């Protein structure tokens, strides 16, 4: 597609399988960077031939590749992913594109920010929806042990507060023996 994408190839393979199985009508991506993953998601969804929208949110759109920016099925928003206006936009898009949601969290990797993203999505995701928390492999899970509390710890904190919201898709997570989303493949109960 010609647009840079900072993702694990094995994770991207899993994501396309999840999209085909889930058939979401709305994809919510926190963390845009170049727009390569949003474009990838849009290409996969077009192959299924059903109405959909990709919403990609980032605090800065400066690095956004113009190729991705021109895609008619992607809405790029310059904002913090935890801003209440983002929740309002997701709620509106749910009305326009009813059905399943696939959410992927890959913006600020601090524990508090990821936890805030998960809490923002909590009332917006329904049973059967799918959420991936990326880069939960940092802070010693197994890489970058000195990073400090990050996405992995956010998942743990979220599950302490909301212990019955998600099941872990362990089979998908372990499929290739490596993932950037350690403990982060989550299906809403």
What residue ranges belong to the model's regions?
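S-adenosylmethionine/decaboxylated-SAM
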Residues: 3-189
């Amino acid at each position: 597609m010609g647009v840079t994408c900072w993702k694990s190839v094995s994770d991207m393979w899993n994501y396309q399988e999840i999209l085909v199985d889930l058939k979401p009508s709305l994809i919510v991506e926190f963390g845009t960077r170049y727009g390569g993953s949003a474009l990838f998601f849009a290409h996969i969804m077009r192959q299924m031939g059903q109405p959909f929208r990709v919403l990609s949110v980032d605090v800065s759109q400066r690095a956004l590749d113009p190729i991705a920016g021109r895609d008619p099925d992607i809405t790029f928003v310059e904002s913090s992913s935890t801003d209440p206006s983002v929740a309002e936009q997701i709620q509106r898009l749910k009305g326009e594109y009813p059905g399943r949601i696939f959410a992927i969290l890959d913006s600020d990797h601090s524990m508090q920010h990821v936890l805030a993203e998960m809490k923002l999505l909590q009332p917006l995701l329904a049973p059967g929806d799918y959420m991936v928390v990326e880069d939960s492999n940092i802070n010693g899970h197994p890489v970058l042990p000195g990073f400090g509390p990050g996405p992995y710890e956010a998942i743990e904190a979220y599950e302490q507060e909301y212990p019955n919201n998600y099941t872990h898709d362990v089979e998908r997570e372990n499929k290739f023996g490596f993932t950037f989303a350690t403990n982060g493949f989550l299906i809403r109960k």
